[in-house]
Design a protein with these regions (language model features):
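Long, low-complexity intrinsically disordered regions
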Residues: 1-95, 99-102, 122-221
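Signature of small four-pass
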Residues: 97, 103-120
Length: 221
């Protein structure tokens, strides 16, 4: 009986661990971590190549802040829904979180292309625009995720331990502050960056859309 009890305890512990940290969460966290590690390891651009304009560098760095904040929101929501006992509700969240994860992967790919381009000279308009457009898509996707959370929060409260709910709200507030700060930094560089983004083809209302989406006070947090 003691052996069976110990075995059951180990299985229960493994189940809880798997619920709190899902494989999908690990993949997203690892992808984000690898990107920032690659960024830290990037050497300075060779002196013989054209320098990337400083407004563009500041603009893209603010985009990295948005990526980091969104990845924190993703991890917090994944952990929160993983401990819910409402399987139907969890399935709904898993679908929208899966879309959010893909949008972050696309943003990371766009940032990787930008980082590689800066090593060879000033990136062309298409590379810079891809970062902006991918960022727009990610922010819009996560806005839908947060809106869904806002609608389903009362139901989640009955299926998730209150400790997880408190932690989730704290992380969301911190992430939203980071998002708004990054959006303000991007907006400050918008006029200077616009000629580089619009060199080939204007990206329709990209700057205004991003600022409106991230800075919208109606975002449910």
């Amino acid at each position: 009986a003691a052996t069976r009890s110990a075995s059951e305890s180990r299985e229960a512990g493994a189940a809880v661990t798997g619920a709190v940290a899902s494989p999908a969460e690990h993949i997203v966290d690892a992808e984000r971590t690898r990107y920032f590690r690659r960024l830290s390891a990037l050497p300075s651009a060779p002196p013989n190549v054209a320098a990337t304009p400083k407004p563009v560098l500041k603009f893209v760095d603010a985009t990295r802040g948005i990526l980091f904040a969104l990845s924190q929101i993703y991890s917090a929501l994944t952990q929160h829904t993983a401990v819910s006992t409402d399987e139907r509700l969890v399935a709904h969240f898993q679908r929208v979180l899966g879309i959010a994860a893909k949008s972050m992967s696309a943003l990371i790919s766009a940032l990787d292309r930008f980082d590689a381009a800066t090593q060879a000279g000033a990136p062309d308009a298409g590379v810079i625009r891809a970062v902006l457009d991918s960022c727009n898509v990610s922010v819009r996707t996560f806005r839908r995720v947060i809106s869904m959370l806002h609608m389903q929060l009362p139901q989640l409260e009955h299926s998730v331990n209150v400790r997880f709910s408190r932690t989730l709200l704290l992380l969301l507030c911190g992430s939203m502050a980071e998002l708004r700060n990054s959006a303000e930094l991007m907006a400050a560089q918008a006029d200077a960056v616009a000629p580089y983004v619009n060199e080939e083809r204007p990206s329709e209302h990209s700057f205004d859309t991003l600022a409106d989406t991230v800075g919208d006070e109606s975002l449910p947090v």
